[in-house]
């Protein structure tokens, strides 16, 4: 391997020590001031490598690695996000390295929280490898600090080995990807790449150029509260309206769907007798099917409202991101270039669609074609997240192979 295992692991551990949880309740970019800490650290490290790097007013980090020899090649962008998911704590992450010999891995001090192949069958693939795991109280942050570390280690390798030929490389690190806003203020024109890759995938080999179309929805339920002792025929309980609404939807949920099947996902609920609110995300690979899901919400609300003299349920839908496939169908040489790089390293590309989204989806629709590459981590967004060290090294090796090989038109 050309990439230093010791260096990239130290780099990853340094980055996950900084809390960068994004905040979905904030309208600012970045949504959390904590994201600045990693942004400034990355900018400092890039400049220490002798590269031109900057952080803009919205916490986007960009840098350039000038071409060496291969000046006629397209400018390739490499992008990862700095924030971690608000689904689990990212504060005071205490990673540890274990040599996995099979069976269960105790995460917490008492051994009551364990990472096991019974819960996560893919774990068995990593017998004999070193894994970075959590202490059972936080997520790890491999999503996407593994991608950040892989890109930074590539930059370190190329700047310490100036004899290696490569084309011009643009580096971008974004805030707020986990709350769907990572690419919204990204300066595509200023980035000036011909195409790019996000490094935000999971297991070794993942190469993704298709993702969900996505929308979110807020369902507001208006009740009528009176004293429960005199409520017959009068009280309308907003929480029961909410329960009725959710139970009426098709049973197409994350826990019951797979592959190319879309879903309705209830992500939050709150309420009193007077007012209740449901938050959903809607996902589908087919844009028309996503529109049908939106219509289903409206029809469900209308059906419940028809039982009352007043409009008791209102639905607000917001589009989030679109499937990048419609952009990349005409630029498949970008996907092929990455696939060929993987194959030269003995990796079989895995081209299954992303049951989620990446910054690359939005960037592709903004004119920067941007498929997604693996970063190596697994079980994102929770305490069972882990990162096989060989996978992290291979992510950086793949980037090195991509940027040092001529792109075929």
Residue ranges of model-derived segments:
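Midchain, well-structured core segments that form catalytic/ion-binding scaffolds
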Residues: 123, 129-142, 176-305, 311-313, ...
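N-terminal capping segment at the start of a domain
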Residues: 5-33, 133, 225, 321, ...
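Active-site metal-coordination/substrate-binding segment of hydrolases
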Residues: 71-168, 173, 193
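His/Asp/Glu-rich mid-to-C-terminal helical/loop segments that flank catalytic regions of hydrolases
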Residues: 8, 37, 236-253, 288-300, ...
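Short pre-catalytic strand/loop immediately N-terminal to key active-site residues, enriched for Gly-Thr
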Residues: 133-141, 348-352, 382-383
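Flexible, glycine/charged-enriched surface loops at secondary-structure junctions
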Residues: 24, 56, 163-168, 251-265, ...
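A non-catalytic alpha/beta surface segment that caps or lines the substrate-entry region
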Residues: 27-73, 77-83
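Active-site-adjacent substrate-binding region
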Residues: 240-256, 263-265, 312, 322-374
């Amino acid at each position: 391997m050309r990439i230093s295992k010791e260096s990239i692991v130290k780099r990853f551990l340094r980055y996950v020590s900084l809390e960068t949880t994004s905040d979905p309740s904030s309208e600012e970019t970045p949504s959390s001031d904590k994201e600045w800490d990693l942004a400034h650290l990355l900018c400092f490290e890039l400049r220490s490598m002798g590269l031109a790097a900057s952080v803009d007013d919205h916490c986007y980090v960009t840098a350039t690695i000038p071409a060496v020899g291969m000046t006629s090649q397209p400018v390739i962008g490499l992008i990862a996000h700095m924030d971690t998911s608000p689904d689990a704590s990212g504060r005071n992450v205490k990673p540890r390295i274990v040599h996995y010999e099979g069976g269960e891995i105790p995460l917490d001090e008492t051994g009551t929280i364990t990472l096991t192949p019974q819960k996560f069958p893919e774990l068995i693939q990593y017998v004999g490898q070193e894994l970075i795991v959590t202490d059972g109280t936080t997520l790890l942050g491999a999503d996407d600090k593994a991608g950040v570390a892989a890109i930074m280690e590539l930059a370190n390798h190329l700047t310490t080995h100036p004899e290696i030929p490569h084309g011009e490389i643009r580096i971008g690190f974004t805030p707020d990807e986990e709350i769907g806003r990572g690419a919204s203020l990204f300066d595509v024109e200023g980035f000036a790449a011909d195409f790019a890759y996000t490094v935000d995938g999971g297991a070794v080999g993942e190469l993704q150029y298709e993702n969900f179309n996505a929308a979110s929805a807020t369902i507001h339920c208006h009740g009528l509260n009176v004293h429960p002792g005199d409520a017959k025929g009068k009280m309308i309980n907003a929480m029961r309206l909410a329960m009725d609404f959710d139970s009426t939807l098709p049973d197409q949920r994350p826990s019951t769907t797979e592959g190319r099947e879309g879903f309705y996902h209830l992500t939050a609920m709150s309420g009193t007798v007077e007012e209740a609110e449901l938050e959903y995300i809607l996902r589908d690979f087919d844009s028309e099917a996503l529109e049908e899901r939106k219509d289903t919400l409206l029809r469900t609300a209308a059906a419940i409202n028809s039982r009352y003299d007043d409009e008791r349920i209102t639905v607000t839908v917001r589009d989030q991101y679109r499937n990048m496939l419609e952009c990349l169908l005409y630029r498949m040489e970008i996907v092929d270039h990455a696939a060929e790089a993987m194959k030269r390293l003995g990796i079989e590309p895995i081209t299954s669609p992303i049951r989620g989204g990446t910054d690359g989806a939005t960037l592709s629709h903004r004119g920067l074609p941007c498929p997604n590459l693996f970063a190596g981590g697994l079980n994102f967004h929770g305490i069972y997240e882990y990162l096989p060290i060989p996978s992290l090294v291979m992510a950086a090796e793949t980037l090195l192979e991509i940027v040092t090989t001529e792109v075929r038109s």
